[in-house]
């Protein structure tokens, strides 16, 4: 599995990479702009990401803008919805407004912080990313 993570907090990045790296290659970006750029490069190389983990509150470009950029790249390339990357929002913003916005923009699962490894792994199983 190929994983892209956009997270500006060092401790969270280290934690997430620590448990996600056992499932596959994990690329890390620190803002939404880098995430969209990395996603585009992966598509151009013919090696798209299977899973994208996006924080919402990040510098340069927030997670919502990054999610829109990622979904637009997939749409522009004619990638069918069932073949698109699974996007899990990983954020401390757990209020109804933010959850609703993320799903409207195309996230697959919303996972509030602090991240619970077991729940996160269950979400990945539900998405068919791991056994």
State where each predicted segment sits:
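Active-site beta3 strand of CheY-like receiver
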Residues: 43-53
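Short amphipathic alpha-helix used as the core "switch/output" element in two-component signaling
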Residues: 37, 41, 64-82
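Helix N-cap/capping motif at the beta->alpha junctions
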Residues: 10, 28-41, 63
């Amino acid at each position: 599995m190929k994983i892209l993570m956009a997270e500006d907090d060092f401790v969270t990045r280290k934690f997430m990479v620590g448990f996600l790296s056992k499932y596959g290659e994990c690329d890390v970006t620190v803002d939404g702009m880098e995430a969209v750029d990395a996603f585009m490069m992966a598509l151009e190389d013919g090696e798209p990401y299977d899973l994208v983990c996006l924080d919402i509150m990040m510098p340069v470009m927030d997670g919502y803008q990054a999610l829109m950029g990622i979904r637009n790249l997939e749409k522009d390339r004619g990638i069918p919805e069932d073949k698109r990357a699974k996007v899990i929002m990983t954020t401390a913003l757990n209020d109804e407004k933010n959850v609703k916005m993320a799903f409207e923009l195309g996230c697959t699962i919303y996972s509030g912080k602090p991240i619970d490894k077991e729940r996160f792994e269950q979400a990945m199983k539900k998405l068919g990313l791991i056994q």
